[in-house]
Amino acid sequence: KYIQEFKNNLTEIGKPSVTKSKVKPYTKVSFKPDYARLGISGLSEDMLSLFKKRVYDVSAITDKTIKVKLNGQVVPCKNFEQYIDLYVGSKTDTKRVYEQTDPRWEYAVCLAPNDEFQQVSFVNGIYTSKGGKHVEYIMNQIIRKLCVYIKQKKKVDVKPTTIKEQLMLFLRCDIENPSFNSQTKDELGTAVPKFGSSCTVSDGFIEKIAKMGVM
């Protein structure tokens, strides 16, 4: 059992304590904000909500055998599909198409609620709020194949932007040595050839999206 404490912006680093554990392996992270240093009197509801979201993020994108707890309660979100439900409701509430062609790539698409493209994506467990090359990689395949599919079925040429603005993408992927466009790591900058793996969106996935209401 390894325990170590850090204080005052890592200026004070306590000595590690290593003892034999009597329980199953686990990781516990706890912290006490220095309100005076931060210039606040306490944590706002928005801050608490953000912390809660990050805990749910961890639960959704880590191994399914790992139990994640928040304030002593197991988080009821064990996989990426259940995580998607938190955004758009159940599959009955909102139709979506899900696919995992490789352990490194997992994604789902539903119709955008406001006719404006939206994305929720993760790279190696990091939430990329601005998307990036991984989102472009998957979306470009989806849009290109949908244009071809609609052309074949309806004999109509559709602009890529018309399709994109109808969709909402959820994406989780693992990238080798990812690079980001800023220190906030909210946008992936790694070029596609350096991903370390590839992903091909299946034709069946495209057909299901078309039948979902895009076409």
Protein language model features and the residues they cover:
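Charged, low-complexity, helix-prone segments enriched in Lys/Glu/Asp/Gln
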Residues: 1, 145-149, 215
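GHKL-type ATPase core
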Residues: 1-86
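GHKL/Histidine-kinase-like ATPase module
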Residues: 49-186
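Extended, well-ordered alpha-helical scaffold/bundle regions in very large, multi-domain proteins
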Residues: 29, 160-215
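Short, compositionally biased low-complexity segments
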Residues: 20-31, 61-65, 108-118, 193-215
